[in-house]
């Protein structure tokens, strides 16, 4: 078995449906991986009918249902124990892969490579800064938590957390990879162990990335393949987010910074508290909203998939727009004539960044997210 892909689902059945559809295409498109890949989905007690909805759609994938939400790290380790692959991919359910993403990443491994991550863009095509990160030392953490990184995004000092000085279009050896797409050699995980299960949510990817580095392996940011990561769907930035974020940062501080001076500890704790209060003050995550009683749509991509999508939208009283600029919903339809890779390239190269919606051939929904800190929207069709 070449690769095992582990996903954790929690009440995002339509987002993970689109994700699994793209994973299936990536496996089937690769001679290297066809019949040499396995997909394991651990469901953390979803209440949205995921475990009834998903298994019939993906009969070749393995679904494991938990009776309670055990947290991301523990569920990942649960999936890891079932893996038989030489490479393990930890993948978020709110992602869409290009058809060549898996093979490209596997081929990028050198003898000293421990893990590989990719260039990630949101649903509007904007590059996500967390695609490449440095170790969150004292100064880097403080500047990130207080928002200074946003003021100086290209600074090697103020934006050290996101390695802002590195060209996002080039490959780099980095400290920290994103858990949204983290491909790790299984033999490396045998040395480092999996995720630290004390992290219920957040920072577990930072911790594992750093342990891979400490074990003497390289973490590689690979710029030549891109994926979509909606991000907001798995990061609900409300009071609950603030609690788990604060909990994770306190654990991380204790694990890596407990020997620092009292003043340094005070700075880090203050920055964490500032971030928590900011999240609480901002309130619940924004939801994608629409301004027209009847929503106008514009379809691009595969003709066959688009025709089926158009039929379903008309049945739901959506209206076709006269032009793309007149549309409230710009929908990219994947299919034989338009791959996920070409769709990702289109939104990356678009001169104007705006929200898009996505539909995989044969799936039952459209998904999209207007903001990286907003919960996504699902239109069931």
Regions found by a protein language model. Name each.
Residues 22, 43-52, 68:
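A conserved acidic beta->alpha catalytic loop
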């Amino acid at each position: 078995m070449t690769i095992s892909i582990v996903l954790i689902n929690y009440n995002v059945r339509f987002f993970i449906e689109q994700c699994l559809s793209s994973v299936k295409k990536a496996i089937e498109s690769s001679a290297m991986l066809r019949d040499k890949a396995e997909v394991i989905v651990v469901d953390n007690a979803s209440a949205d009918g995921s475990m009834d909805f998903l298994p019939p759609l993906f009969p070749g994938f393995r679904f494991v249902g938990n009776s309670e939400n055990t947290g991301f790290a523990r569920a990942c380790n649960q999936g890891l124990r079932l893996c038989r692959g030489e490479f393990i991919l930890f993948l978020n359910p709110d992602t869409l892969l290009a058809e060549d993403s898996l093979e490209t990443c596997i081929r990028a491994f050198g003898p000293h490579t421990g893990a590989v991550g990719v260039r990630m863009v949101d649903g509007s095509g904007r590059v996500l800064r967390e695609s490449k990160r440095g170790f969150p030392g004292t100064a880097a953490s403080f500047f990130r938590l207080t928002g200074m990184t946003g003021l100086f995004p290209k600074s090697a000092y103020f934006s050290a957390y996101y390695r802002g000085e590195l060209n996002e279009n080039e490959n780099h050896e980095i400290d920290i990879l994103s858990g949204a797409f983290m491909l790790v050699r299984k033999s490396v995980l045998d040395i480092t162990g999996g995720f630290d299960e004390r992290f219920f949510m957040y920072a577990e990817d930072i911790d594992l990335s750093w342990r891979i580095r400490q074990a003497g392996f390289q973490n590689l940011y690979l710029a030549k393949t891109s994926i979509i990561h909606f991000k907001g769907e798995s990061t609900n930035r409300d009071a609950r987010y603030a609690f788990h974020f604060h909990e994770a940062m306190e654990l991380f501080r204790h694990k890596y910074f407990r020997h620092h001076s009292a003043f340094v500890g005070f700075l880090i704790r203050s920055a964490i508290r500032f971030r928590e209060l900011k999240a609480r003050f901002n309130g619940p995550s924004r939801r994608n909203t629409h301004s027209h009683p009847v929503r106008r749509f514009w379809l691009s991509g595969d003709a066959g998939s688009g025709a089926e999508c158009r039929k379903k939208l008309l049945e739901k009283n959506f209206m076709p727009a006269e032009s793309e600029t007149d549309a409230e919903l710009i929908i990219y339809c994947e299919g034989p004539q338009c791959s996920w890779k070409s769709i990702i390239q289109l939104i990356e190269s678009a001169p104007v960044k705006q929200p898009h919606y996505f539909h995989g051939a044969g799936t039952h929904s459209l998904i999209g997210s207007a903001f990286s800190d907003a919960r996504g929207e699902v239109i069931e069709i």
